[in-house]
From Swiss-Prot:
One of its GO terms (cellular component) is cytoplasm. This is Glutamyl-tRNA(Gln) amidotransferase subunit E. Belongs to the GatB/GatE family. GatE subfamily. Transmembrane segments: none annotated. The lineage of its organism: Archaea, Methanobacteriati, Thermoplasmatota, Thermoplasmata, Thermoplasmatales. The gene is gatE. Keywords: ATP-binding, Ligase, Nucleotide-binding, Protein biosynthesis.
Length: 598
């Protein structure tokens, strides 16, 4: 990164395994569905009598929320019972982590309600409390300040989104979540990854962090002088670099597009309004348009001075607007920089341009929308165009594999108001003594504890800690020898991921290893089973019965070697193992192969 004005901060969220925060339900679930119910959430005012922009936006989307009640949720998650007092183990863990991060611990824990009406909480708000403030960590590029350590409830897990309805599972709602927020002291994307790792060590070392694929999530706060962008829910450390690189390119593009539009005379909002052009498209052969006309009508609007900026060369304003309309349930939009296209011919679009009195430098947007949505969408698109051109880029965005997409406006203080069901909690001596028993340590101490606990080398322990694989090591070591578990995590799985260009959920790998352990299979059989999983995507229950896991006897190995020699293949002690692997699917003990050579 070469931009001088870049500022980066992180908000890192860690799920805890202590039991849910405001009820006595466990955090884990068998996945059993008990029943479902629906809710419609409406915006409310903050304690200052204002309505938050993000909450207003979600309210205008007018969606229905369906909730799946699971075996680890109760009436508290359904918002039919008041919350219980917060989980003391979770509080003690949060205090331990805050202390390790050099924070000042507050004398009182005061919960607040944060208005959230995207459906991720049945109540329409999330409960959160500050535990510690004014901390810091030392890094290779200087001190990074920790602004707050909070303890809050996690959101419901989105399962499905369909026309006008979002389906959530309550299995995740209410899981304790430690949120650690930094000041914008991070210099570049590599530094962001380093900071995220260092903070992660302090939480993982407590032994209280949950072992699940989505148990750690990063929100990346980014600015290069055009307002703060929050990239919410980055699940992988490697993804931090990619989304930051994309966001720099995106904001560079928007700056250039803004300069060009202003040079031309700017965007005239008074001329931006949708007119019905369905009559001009009734005879089109475009499948895209005809499909949209089955459930709505065609509308077009003039975007003064936007020609060439919607999609041409490096400009991509059209994508910015398409992300917005998708949030309102539309599939996207068509615009003049891509037309003719999508089956629309020049004879289809020229009458639209004529009706709008389009000039050479003007752009045109075409929407296929139900009539009842076009009013609010018109206002939101106009607002967004003006916002982008003025370079007010502050908003919440979501990560994709290598980019970001618009989620909602940036929320602010107007979404906060006091919690009325949970009393203020004094941080007593008992709570502090409980937190003293929970050890939160940095990288070096974590490596030392791994070596002591599992008897593995310092190099391997550092690799596991650096790759944040301590929880996986703990899980695998219940089924395998710790040294073999470390080998699987640091060598076997990375090798197979690279060889077969695929990744598997850790839970699936653990299921396979557990089944192998139940049958007393050795390390060679475990490694062969993992290769079958990666190469064939086979059910673990079937893999354990695969005949390729039957180990060759010494006589069988010697027989294969003799046949290979007779066929003219030169076999030595140096190459016998690699030659055998190419000529048999079954596993074998390498030492036996060497013995066959005398």
């Amino acid at each position: 990164m070469t931009h001088r004005n870049i500022k980066i901060g992180l908000e890192i969220h860690f799920q805890l395994n202590t039991g849910k925060l405001f009820c006595r339900c466990p955090v884990e679930t068998s996945g059993t569905e008990k029943y479902r119910f629906e809710r419609h959430l409406h915006v409310s005012e903050s304690e200052m009598g204002r309505i938050d922009a993000a909450a207003k936006y979600e309210s205008e989307r007018s969606r229905t929320f369906e909730y799946v009640v699971t075996d680890n949720s109760c009436l508290v998650e359904c918002d039919e019972d008041p919350p219980k007092m917060p989980n003391e183990d979770a509080i003690a863990t949060a205090i331990s982590v805050a202390r390790a991060l050099n924070c000042d611990i507050l004398d009182y824990i005061t919960y607040m309600r944060k208005i959230v009406i995207d459906g991720s909480n049945t109540s329409g708000f999330q409960r959160t409390a500050i535990i510690g403030i004014n901390g810091y960590i030392e890094t290779s590029k200087g001190k990074v300040r920790i602004s707050t350590v909070c303890l809050e409830e996690d959101a419901a897990r989105k399962i499905e989104e369909k026309e006008g309805t979002v389906v959530y599972s309550l299995d995740r709602l209410g899981i304790p979540l430690i949120e650690i927020s930094t000041e914008p002291d991070i210099i570049d994307e590599e530094h962001a990854v380093e900071v995220a790792k260092k903070i992660g060590y302090y939480v993982i070392s407590t032994g209280k962090s949950r072992k699940a694929p989505d148990s750690v999530r990063q929100d990346v706060n980014f600015s290069m002088g055009f307002g703060r962008v929050e990239i919410k829910g980055v699940s992988k450390l490697s993804q931090i670099k990619e989304v930051l690189k994309y966001e720099i390119q995106r904001q560079d593009m928007l700056k250039k597009a803004s300069d060009l539009i202003k040079l031309r005379g700017g965007f005239d909002r008074s001329r931006f309004y949708f007119i019905d052009v369905t009559d001009l498209l009734v005879n089109t052969s475009s499948k895209v348009v005809n499909s949209g006309l089955k459930t709505g009508r065609a509308y077009a609007a003039l975007c003064t001075n936007l020609a060439g900026t919607l999609k041409s060369g490096e400009y991509r304003l059209g994508k910015e607007l398409a992300d917005l309309v998708r949030a309102y349930g539309l599939k996207g939009l068509l615009h003049s920089d891509e037309l003719p296209g999508y089956g629309l011919k020049e004879s289809d679009i020229q009458p639209i341009y004529d009706r709008l009195q389009k000039d050479e430098l003007d752009g045109v947007i075409i929407l296929l929308s139900p009539q009842e949505k076009i009013g609010i969408i018109e206002e939101e698109i106009a607002n967004r165009i003006e916002k982008l051109i003025s370079l007010d880029l502050s908003e919440t965005r979501g990560p994709t594999e290598d980019s970001t997409v618009f989620l909602r406006p940036m929320p602010g203080k107007d979404r906060m108001y006091p919690e009325t069901d949970i009393p203020v909690i004094a941080v007593s001596k008992d709570i502090l003594q409980k937190s003293d028993k929970i050890k939160s340590v940095g990288f070096e101490d974590l490596v030392s504890s791994i070596i002591t606990k599992y008897g593995i080398s310092k190099q391997v322990a550092e690799s596991l800690a650096s790759d944040m694989k301590i929880q996986e090591l703990e899980e695998l070591s219940t089924y395998l020898d710790p040294r073999e578990s470390a080998r699987v995590l640091t060598q076997i799985i990375p090798y197979l991921e690279k060889k077969y260009a695929k990744k598997f959920d850790n839970n699936l790998i653990f299921v396979l290893v557990r089944l192998m352990s139940d049958r007393k299979f050795d390390r060679y059989q475990v490694e062969k089973a993992l290769e079958i999983l990666f190469s064939e995507n086979k059910d673990p229950a079937l893999i354990v019965s695969d005949e390729r896991l039957i180990e060759l006897t010494k006589d069988e190995i010697c027989e294969i070697i003799d046949k290979l020699k007779k066929s003219g293949i030169t076999i030595t002690k140096a190459n016998v193992v690699s030659v055998l692997k190419k000529n048999t699917d079954r596993i074998f003990d390498p030492s036996m192969a060497i013995e066959c050579l005398g």
